[in-house]
From Swiss-Prot:
Signal sequence coordinates: none
Name of the encoding gene: dxs
Domain of life: Bacteria
Catalytic activity: D-glyceraldehyde 3-phosphate + pyruvate + H(+) = 1-deoxy-D-xylulose 5-phosphate + CO2
Cofactor stoichiometry and binding remark: Binds 1 Mg(2+) ion per subunit. Binds 1 thiamine pyrophosphate per subunit.
Organism: Syntrophomonas wolfei subsp. wolfei (strain DSM 2245B / Goettingen)
Cellular component GO terms, alphabetical: cytosol
GO BP terms in the entry: 1-deoxy-D-xylulose 5-phosphate biosynthetic process; isopentenyl diphosphate biosynthetic process, methylerythritol 4-phosphate pathway; terpenoid biosynthetic process; thiamine biosynthetic process
SUPFAM superfamilies xrefs: Thiamin diphosphate-binding fold (THDP-binding) (SSF52518), TK C-terminal domain-like (SSF52922)
Protein name, as recorded: 1-deoxy-D-xylulose-5-phosphate synthase
Keyword Phosphoprotein: no
Listed pathway(s): Metabolic intermediate biosynthesis; 1-deoxy-D-xylulose 5-phosphate biosynthesis; 1-deoxy-D-xylulose 5-phosphate from D-glyceraldehyde 3-phosphate and pyruvate: step 1/1
């Protein structure tokens, strides 16, 4: 079944294959992709769309000497298969297995770590300039999608690359047909001419190129003489790239191996910055993904025969947010929703269909999204910016300068906060408390369950100034959402359990963990107070200060980085209040956390209930009886 694929252990093995063998290899790779993602979850549709492109790149170029940088990196599975990681695909995105994104620590063939969008051209240009300064001659290739090309950073890099005139190849993987549909015989003929080294084509030479097109060429050339600028813009679909200093080539059929190899071979010999525009189809070769590429962009485990995903019984926080937005929009005609190319991921698909005039998908432009919201808020609207925690980092200055400084009522719905699991360190939302907490005028909340999320969203519309609500990926706690909404006052915490031995102050996902810790402590004869803080800023200073003064032992639990997070805020507050109390902070460590199931990651980080119990016993052994201490000691040694 995989008779060719099993012989491919490095890109060198591709160079001896015939075209029919490579076509068969493409089919075998697609079968492995479907099998692997069905088991492990991941990005399927985009990888099915770049099989031929990946094969052609690794056949023409000599990786790892030649550098190939995959923008975002979610489409690099084929690259991994071709570079010695075929046997590890069964561990894709699993703890201890291979990453779902390029990772320099994983392989010498991964030239640059990616995970966020639109960084590839900047990184590739940096490598090209470093190569030039060091007198080297290797090729540098950036592979970027049409969606990623919407980001300002990509255009900044294109602009700079055109000025530098260094040898750099940018492959535009257009899998949405959003830039050009001009694929056909005439385009193929032009591509052959454009990439033939005997034609050093310039804008001034376009007439000679037109003359070589069979049949219609001379007439077009005569028209070009009369309408030079018009013809230039009509005949060169990538004129924007030409004006930026790139030689534009394309569109090329991204599934035609022979064409791709021929064009790339010629491009490799050309000088200066080159942009190759390829047209690919997401989901190619697997019908469910081909028919619904958006569903199979990022997908959980599924049944290969039907494409049906394994369903979860509870609603996700994302779905609950989406439901709230639909209901709120019916009551408040000033509500508008903004997202940065994450309509489905942030739960706004139904909103976009029901309220298209009040929905704005700005593309991969988080900075613009935030300042767009600021402009709307300054003019009387109530914008909600729905964004992943890890991507909101990209708009930090806009949050500070354009929103918070002016106290504008923008609501940030921050999805995928804390650990997100299998997507790993580039996607964990580990830092939002830390990078938001010190911004003046900003209120920050984190729900412990589904009902609390709805209460916080409801309350945000009554608060003055900007509000950030961060919530985790995945399903909720199974709490019933009440029909009556509670209007929360800024800083208002919730007492969950009275106690007498120590105080536990938790927030967000930390509350669920804290509940389990309380149960474990009760089994050891320890009775703690448990408070759901709800707010990271402002803190409920009265409740927290009172607990510290009464118990003198304070345990904080959060799923944010320890540095600058919720626990740090409490420590700072106690110093300000002059309260002497012993603190134990449970939070994410000062390191980038690997990929894997969230529950397993918490266990590895000693943030699961059993590990926290051990930490409490180590910090305050006097809370436990002699027998309990001995049991905990033995447990910790096992």
């Amino acid at each position: 079944m995989d008779e060719i694929l099993n012989t491919i252990n490095s890109p060198r093995d591709l160079k001896k294959l015939s075209l029919p063998e490579m076509t068969q290899l493409a089919n075998e790779i697609r079968q492995l992709l479907v099998k692997s993602v069905a088991k492990c979850g991941g990005h399927l549709a985009s990888n099915l769309g770049v099989v031929e492109l990946s094969l052609a790149l690794h056949t023409v170029f000599d990786s790892p000497e030649d550098k190939i940088i995959w923008d975002v990196g979610h489409q690099a599975y084929v690259h991994k298969i071709l570079t010695g990681r075929r046997e590890q695909m069964s561990t894709l995105r699993q703890y201890g297995g291979i990453s779902g994104f390029p990772k320099v620590e994983e392989s010498e063939y991964d030239a640059f770590n990616t995970g966020h969008s639109s960084t590839s051209i900047s990184a590739a240009l940096g490598m090209a300039l470093a190569r030039d300064l060091q007198g080297q001659s290797n090729s540098v290739v950036a592979v970027i999608g049409d969606g990623a090309l919407t980001a300002g950073m990509a255009f900044e890099a294109l602009n700079h690359a055109g000025q530098e005139d260094s040898d750099l190849i940018v492959v535009l993987n257009d899998n949405e047909m959003s830039i050009s549909k001009n694929v056909g015989a005439m385009s193929a003929y032009l591509n052959r001419l454009r990439t033939d080294p005997s034609y050093s084509r310039t804008k001034e030479e376009i007439e000679s190129v037109l003359n070589r097109i069979p049949g219609i060429g001379p007439n077009l050339a005569r028209a070009a003489g009369k309408f030079k600028d018009t013809v230039k813009y009509l005949m060169v679909p990538g004129i924007i790239f030409e004006e930026l200093g790139f030689t534009y080539i394309g569109p090329v059929n991204g599934h035609d191996l022979a064409e791709l190899k021929a064009v790339l071979s010629n491009i490799k010999k050309m000088k200066g910055p080159i942009l190759l525009h390829t047209i690919t189809q997401k989901g190619k070769g697997y019908e469910p993904a081909f028919q619904k590429p958006d569903i199979f962009h990022g997908v959980g485990p599924f049944d290969v025969d039907t494409g049906t995903q394994l369903k979860k019984s509870l609603k996700t926080y994302t779905e609950i947010f989406g439901d709230f937005m639909l209901n709120q929009a019916q009551r408040d005609n000033k509500l508008v929703a903004i997202t940065a190319a994450m309509t489905s991921g942030t739960g706004l698909s139904e909103f976009s269909r029901n309220f298209p005039e009040r929905f704005f998908d700005v593309g991969i432009c988080e900075q613009h999204a935030v300042t767009l919201a600021a402009g709307m808020a300054s003019s009387g609207l109530r914008p909600v910016v729905a964004v992943y925690s890890t991507f909101l980092q990209r708009a930090y200055d806009q949050i500070v300068h354009d929103v918070a400084l002016q106290k504008l009522p923008v609501i940030f719905a921050i999805d995928r906060a804390g650990l997100v699991g299998e997507d790993g360190p580039t996607h964990h939302g580990a830092f939002d408390f830390s990078y938001l907490r010190h911004i003046p005028n900003l209120i920050i909340m984190a729900p412990a369950d589904e009902n609390e999320l709805v209460d916080m969203l409801h309350s945000a519309f009554s608060m003055e100034g900007p509000v950030a609500i961060r919530y985790p990926r995945g399903v909720g706690e199974g709490v019933r959402i009440k029909s009556e909404r509670q209007l929360l006052e800024p800083g208002q915490s919730r007492l969950i359990a009275e106690g007498q031995d120590l105080a536990i102050i938790a927030v967000g996902r930390g509350v669920s963990i804290a509940r389990d810790v309380v149960d474990l402590l009760a089994g050891k004869g320890v009775n703690p107070l448990l408070v759901d803080a709800r707010f990271v800023k402002p803190l409920d200073r009265r409740v927290i200060a009172g607990a510290a003064q009464k118990y003198h032992r304070l345990l904080t639990i959060e799923d944010n980085s320890l540095a600058g997070g919720f626990g740090s805020a409490i420590g700072e507050m106690l110093v300000e209040e002059g309260i002497d109390a012993e603190l134990l902070h449970i939070a994410l460590p000062d390191e980038f956390v690997e990929h894997g199931r969230v529950e397993l990651l918490f266990e590895q980080l000693n943030m699961n209930p059993d590990s926290i119990l051990e930490s409490i016993a180590g910090k305050w052994p006097e809370l436990f009886s002699a027998g309990s201490r001995w049991e905990l000691l033995k447990f910790g040694q096992n």
